[in-house]
Amino acid sequence: TKEFFVHSMDLRTNHYYTPDGLARMVRKASGTRYYNRIAYSLQPLTDSTCNILFDVTENPLTFAKIGLHYNEFSGISAILNLTNRDFFIPNSRDLVTLNIGENFRFRAEHLQYLGRISNFAFTLGTQFDQFNITTYNNYKESGLYDQSYLKFDGKLGYSTNRNLTIGIGSRFEWIKYNPNIASSLEFEGKNNFLTSYFFIRQNTLDKPSYPKRGIKIDAEADWVYTQNADVVVHQTPTSLDSVFSEDPYGRVLFNFESYSPVGRRGTILANIQAGINFNYQNNIMNEFSIGGLTPLFHNEITFAGLREGTFYSPSVAEFRLGYRYQMFTNTYLTARANILFNNFISTSSFFINPDVLSGYALTFTYNFALGPLEVSAMYCDQSRRVIGYVNIGIPF
């Protein structure tokens, strides 16, 4: 509506605006994703003031998307998305996304803009994931289990501008492990807990895929309340009911991405990831999974050189540098090197992890209609193995 557009920019009559100020206001309105195109012109008046004329093209209120995705970890899947704006309440967005394939995933979300300039947003959402996850022992496949994950989430965010959001929220999480092929150490059972958190999100990337400049920050400080574990440990040669801690604990999650152009075709990449559970000794089912190049599921710390779930750790910090070169239009070659530190705050009572890991990856990418085709070769100094990694399309 006209009112929402004017309010989203905080545009007022009989005010003085500079060209830079108008540009920032237009970017704020674009950040709501309600508009496909916003252009403006100035019409001089006889009293030395101007009328501002806006030419605005709105996005459809309802639209559907269909995509295909393949990854060696998650398999092949079709991704279906339906998004509607202002369906239940004005100034809102509702979406439902399905991932149908070798692993089933579901997400639903309602976002409600609040305030005159829509700088507050209240979000209610739910998500369900089901994965078949390979376990590893000494860097080799040793088992397979089903992981089911369900969460209900509510949060309130405040945007100082469309690039920076801070807020608070709470979520309920339910996790179930069911071994299919038991390894030397497996959990079987379920756990659930409530988490309250404070978050900061910033995104100044010039484009969502293969940006050349900008930063992206996702930071979260959590407090995990009492857990409700109903779990049995299968540990060769016996199975036992271990004593699990249900004590509350704090945790921090952090992800930083930076892109800096070098010449006409080059880009320097930098990435810092951290996941830390404090006072996490006999607690379970909230460790951080180490491995993989593509972020796919909760509590994942990507690492060039290892497959998803090679290690699980309660305290992880990863540092990565890379260089991406655009060979031709939509064709890229990317080199990455990373180092990862474990066990520097909390140490798991159930998982054995090396204190330091280092690895490398070389990726060829062709960006086409279905999304990026990424073929990688990875190497880890500790495993001393070269492994391949393939990702096609944009993940769930």
Task: Name each model-derived stretch.
Residues 10, 15-209, 290-300, 309-317, ...:
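Gram-negative/organellar outer-membrane beta-barrel architecture
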Residues 62-74, 280-282, 345-356:
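Small/polar, glycine/serine/threonine/aspartate-rich low-complexity segments that form flexible
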Residues 263, 366-370, 381-383:
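A generic beta-sheet turn/junction motif
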Residues 2-12:
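Acidic/histidine-rich, surface-exposed loop or edge segments in extracytoplasmic proteins
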Residues 63, 196-201, 205-328:
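C-terminal outer-membrane beta-barrel translocator/porin domains of Gram-negative envelope proteins
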Residues 127-131, 171-175, 220-228, 275-279, ...:
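Short glycine-rich beta-strand segments
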Residues 322-358:
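C-terminal hydrophobic structural anchor segments
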Residues 2-3, 283, 314, 328-335, ...:
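Extended hydrophobic-aromatic, low-complexity segments
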